[in-house]
């Protein structure tokens, strides 16, 4: 299994912190956000390569960081240098798949996710389902729902509807940027883009997939911390206590 980490964004709301430095490498609780994610996932021993998809502006920072890690990490530079010319998350996935000629099961995630629970629970869930999967959490705030990807599910966690930032959200379940795609599904990214699948939001591909292939959304067993702007970053630094292990 390959793990693709989406890290080509420019995090403009965190300027000046991220004006010349990538958000996934900001430190929280003595470790970078990426260190928290990778150190946890690597304990399972099922991921044989981590692929960090970066823009050109920040690629050298990720290269320097990768050199300090023991696991196999490949940094893919998508060639963009400004927020206005970014490829978008789905095109970045396709770019990395094409560049590295990947033909593997894919675990795809945003590189700025900070969790208080182990990702291994989601990896086990996805491997048992052997189907496209994401995670979800309950969001009571209507205003936050308007800015989020929304999933509706049945009693078996099967996704019945998935939408992105719509004015009439169909449920209170927010999809987070963690996805599992078996290799036969990962091959469909190019087809999805040609079919008009949105390219910017990372969940756009799964929204396309779930209308064609049974897909699942696991309820998160803990909390995801949002690092969206300076204020939230400062708050997370005060609150975050690391990953709880069972």
What are these regions, as identified by a protein language model?
Residues 61, 91-95, 121, 204-205, ...:
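Alpha-helical elements of Rossmann-like donor-binding domains used by nucleotide-donor carbohydrate transfer enzymes
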Residues 1-20, 214:
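N-terminal nucleotide-binding beta1-loop-alpha1 segment
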Residues 2-5, 13, 27, 31-108:
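Conserved N-terminal catalytic core of the sugar/cofactor nucleotidyltransferase
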Residues 123-127, 158-226, 230-246:
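Catalytic-core segments of class I nucleotidyltransferases/pyrophosphorylases
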Residues 145-160:
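Conserved catalytic core of nucleotide-sugar-dependent glycosyltransferases
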Residues 117-146:
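Conserved donor-nucleotide/metal-binding helix-loop-beta segment in metal-dependent transferases, i.e.
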Residues 10, 112-113:
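Active-site metal-binding loops of divalent metal-dependent hydrolases
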Residues 113-116, 224:
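A short, conserved beta-strand element in the Rossmann-like catalytic core
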